[in-house]
Amino acid sequence: MADNARAARMAKRIQTIVASAIERDIKDRRLEFVTITDVTMTGDLHDAKVFYTVRGASIEEEPDLEAAAEALHRARGQLRKIVGQQLGVRFTPTLTYSIDTVPEASAHMEALLDRARKRDEELAKLREGAVPAGDADPYKTSSKSESEE
């Protein structure tokens, strides 16, 4: 069983190799807008899970996730060969590709935080003109007890 530091180093190296191979070696137009975001390795260093995101050709255009997944699936053998050549280990890990959902999750979390900030601002505006209920000084003191001390 390999240590976690070696697995992390190998995952980082695989991320770099796959990203540069997609950019330079793989001639598939469907992979133009694919970004490799992360790679995780199993403890035995036999499997690597490659996470990727896809952006659209423009800001308004939606990304074509299915086409990118199909292109990565078709290029998996070539990518594994390139990783094996550049990695220099006895066993080349099996590469599986998974869409990275972190950007969507972070956008959702940002929307929730924005909604909470707006609600806090509304409450602060309501609080500005508010007066406490009841007496101004709820702790009444008798004049006798003050003079006795």
UniProtKB/Swiss-Prot annotation:
Annotated region described as Disordered, given as residue ranges: 124-149
Q: What Gene Ontology molecular function terms does this protein carry?
A: ribosomal small subunit binding
* Gene3D superfamilies reported in the protein's UniProt record: 3.30.300.20
Give the InterPro entries listed for this entry: KH_dom-like_a/b, RbfA, RbfA_dom_sf, Ribosome-bd_factorA_CS
Question: Cellular component GO terms, alphabetically?
Answer: cytosol
Pfam families in alphabetical order:
RBFA (PF02033)
What keywords are assigned to this protein? Cytoplasm, Ribosome biogenesis
GO annotation terms (biological process): maturation of SSU-rRNA
- Where does the record place it? Cytoplasm
Look up the domain of life of the source. Bacteria
Q: Which PROSITE patterns match?
A: RBFA (PS01319)
Outline the subunit composition: Monomer. Binds 30S ribosomal subunits, but not 50S ribosomal subunits or 70S ribosomes.
**Stated role:** One of several proteins that assist in the late maturation steps of the functional core of the 30S ribosomal subunit. Associates with free 30S ribosomal subunits (but not with 30S subunits that are part of 70S ribosomes or polysomes). Required for efficient processing of 16S rRNA. May interact with the 5'-terminal helix region of 16S rRNA.
Please report which protein family the annotation says this sequence is part of: Belongs to the RbfA family.
Q: What is this protein called?
A: Ribosome-binding factor A
The beginning of the lineage is: Bacteria, Bacillati, Actinomycetota, Actinomycetes, Mycobacteriales
